[in-house]
Amino acid sequence: LITLWNVYSFYATYASVDGFDPIKNPIDQNNLSILDKWIIAKTHLLIKYADQSLDTYRVDRFMKSFEVYLDELSNWYIRRNRRRFWKSEDDEDKKSAYATLFHVLENVIKIIAPVLPFVSEVIYQNLIRNSDKNSSESVHLCDYPIAIEEHINKNLIKNVDALKKTIELGRSARSISDFRIRQPLSKALFAVEDDKISKFIVENQDIILDELNVKSIERIS
């Protein structure tokens, strides 16, 4: 609950400061970053799983997956994208970050409404009703979200998850070797069997360089 509320508060605070209007600035697929597409894919995958779980009365299963999803949304997507929200320039990249987070939150509160009726209603009123007066009066009067298959890019999910795993292993290696993150290192070595995943990691190495505080990465066999 705290994580969900913190994500909502983060969006509400900065969107209000910047005067972002989600109705006038819908998602533009051409301006989305890799992580935007990834969290959208994860969101629609969650919608699909939520629908299946609730149909079979397995709320417990859904909540476990929801906790994992919230952790990724908060501790990966938002943490990695803070600079996009904080920067002074009101450019397309910043608008895409806001539009993505609004899309995610709008779907998340509708997904979770049957399980967390009061929290989802409060967020809905502040987030959706304040933005669109033509929207339903309550989250509980909204249609349940439908997963859009074309948004569930499984290859992208696989690639970003591999990138995250590489960073996690890098942090673990630093901890074992007693090298703090604040101490820059010249190179990080990584090994992966899949050439496509390796290519993705190299193409997005800036994330690894920043997360692990290294100057370069190199694949080893």
What residues fall within each predicted segment?
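Feature 926 captures the class I aminoacyl-tRNA synthetase adenylation module centered on the KMSKS loop
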Residues: 1-221
